Amino acid sequence: MRTLWIMAVLLVGVEGSLVELGKMILQETGKNPVTSYGAYGCNCGVLGRGKPKDATDRCCYVHKCCYKKLTDCNPKKDRYSYSWKDKTIVCGENNSCLKELCECDKAVAICLRENLDTYNKKYKNNYLKPFCKKADPC
């Protein structure tokens, strides 16, 4: 079952260290990252771009902006380590870029948790992303 979940996360095309990001989102929100955020709003998941639909979607927009600021690592491929201590994400890298990558993922997971009350099922499977309005630059 766990292998199936990991494969599903990989197929969604979410950027970053997919396994770690997925775990963080699950730990912080209790929601399945693929089914809950894989195609949410204009910014969550694959092809994410556009003016955020709500605070949840804004978390994903800010996350993409965070990735754009990383210069010496590849958010789509590089892997990092973190731990879950006392219900808190602790990034554990000595490499500064991997630490920043982990912090980007940590921030989006916490943001999604803090905005669970704005989660709107009508944006859950938004496959009309090409019709999202252009967002302000990061």
From Swiss-Prot:
<dbReference type="InterPro" id="IPR016090">
    <property type="entry name" value="PLipase_A2_dom"/>
</dbReference>
<dbReference type="GO" id="GO:0016042">
    <property type="term" value="P:lipid catabolic process"/>
</dbReference>
<dbReference type="GO" id="GO:0042130">
    <property type="term" value="P:negative regulation of T cell proliferation"/>
</dbReference>
<feature type="disulfide bond">
    <location>
        <begin position="65"/>
        <end position="138"/>
    </location>
</feature>
<feature type="binding site">
    <location>
        <position position="34"/>
    </location>
    <ligand>
        <name>suramin</name>
    </ligand>
</feature>
<feature type="signal peptide">
    <location>
        <begin position="1"/>
        <end position="16"/>
    </location>
</feature>
<feature type="site" description="Membrane-docking site (MDoS)">
    <location>
        <position position="68"/>
    </location>
</feature>
<dbReference type="GO" id="GO:0050482">
    <property type="term" value="P:arachidonate secretion"/>
</dbReference>
<feature type="site" description="Membrane-docking site (MDoS)">
    <location>
        <position position="129"/>
    </location>
</feature>
<dbReference type="InterPro" id="IPR001211">
    <property type="entry name" value="PLipase_A2"/>
</dbReference>
<keyword id="KW-1015">Disulfide bond</keyword>
<dbReference type="GO" id="GO:0005509">
    <property type="term" value="F:calcium ion binding"/>
</dbReference>
<feature type="disulfide bond">
    <location>
        <begin position="42"/>
        <end position="132"/>
    </location>
</feature>
<feature type="binding site">
    <location>
        <position position="43"/>
    </location>
    <ligand>
        <name>varespladib</name>
    </ligand>
</feature>
<feature type="disulfide bond">
    <location>
        <begin position="73"/>
        <end position="97"/>
    </location>
</feature>
<feature type="site" description="Membrane-disrupting site (MDiS)">
    <location>
        <position position="128"/>
    </location>
</feature>
<comment type="function">
    <text>Snake venom phospholipase A2 homolog that lacks enzymatic activity. In vivo, it displays local myotoxin and edema-inducing activities and is lethal by intraperitoneal injection. The myotoxicity effect is weaker in comparison to other myotoxins, probably due to the formation of high molecular weight complexes and to the oligomeric conformation (conventional dimer). It shows specificity toward neurons and myotubes, but not on a variety of other cell types. This PLA2 excites a cohort of sensory neurons via ATP release and consequent activation of P2RX2 and/or P2RX3 purinergic receptors.</text>
</comment>
<feature type="disulfide bond">
    <location>
        <begin position="44"/>
        <end position="60"/>
    </location>
</feature>
<feature type="binding site">
    <location>
        <position position="48"/>
    </location>
    <ligand>
        <name>suramin</name>
    </ligand>
</feature>
<feature type="binding site">
    <location>
        <position position="63"/>
    </location>
    <ligand>
        <name>varespladib</name>
    </ligand>
</feature>
<feature type="disulfide bond">
    <location>
        <begin position="91"/>
        <end position="102"/>
    </location>
</feature>
<feature type="disulfide bond">
    <location>
        <begin position="59"/>
        <end position="111"/>
    </location>
</feature>
<dbReference type="GO" id="GO:0005576">
    <property type="term" value="C:extracellular region"/>
</dbReference>
<dbReference type="Pfam" id="PF00068">
    <property type="entry name" value="Phospholip_A2_1"/>
</dbReference>
<keyword id="KW-0732">Signal</keyword>
<comment type="similarity">
    <text>Belongs to the phospholipase A2 family. Group II subfamily. K49 sub-subfamily.</text>
</comment>
<feature type="site" description="Membrane-docking site (MDoS)">
    <location>
        <position position="77"/>
    </location>
</feature>
<dbReference type="GO" id="GO:0047498">
    <property type="term" value="F:calcium-dependent phospholipase A2 activity"/>
</dbReference>
<feature type="site" description="Membrane-docking site (MDoS)">
    <location>
        <position position="134"/>
    </location>
</feature>
<keyword id="KW-0800">Toxin</keyword>
<keyword id="KW-0964">Secreted</keyword>
<feature type="binding site">
    <location>
        <position position="45"/>
    </location>
    <ligand>
        <name>suramin</name>
    </ligand>
</feature>
<feature type="site" description="Membrane-docking site (MDoS)">
    <location>
        <position position="76"/>
    </location>
</feature>
<feature type="site" description="Membrane-docking site (MDoS)">
    <location>
        <position position="64"/>
    </location>
</feature>
<dbReference type="GO" id="GO:0006644">
    <property type="term" value="P:phospholipid metabolic process"/>
</dbReference>
<feature type="binding site">
    <location>
        <position position="85"/>
    </location>
    <ligand>
        <name>suramin</name>
    </ligand>
</feature>
<feature type="site" description="Membrane-disrupting site (MDiS)">
    <location>
        <position position="131"/>
    </location>
</feature>
<dbReference type="GO" id="GO:0005543">
    <property type="term" value="F:phospholipid binding"/>
</dbReference>
<dbReference type="InterPro" id="IPR033112">
    <property type="entry name" value="PLipase_A2_Asp_AS"/>
</dbReference>
<keyword id="KW-0959">Myotoxin</keyword>
<dbReference type="GO" id="GO:0090729">
    <property type="term" value="F:toxin activity"/>
</dbReference>
<dbReference type="InterPro" id="IPR036444">
    <property type="entry name" value="PLipase_A2_dom_sf"/>
</dbReference>
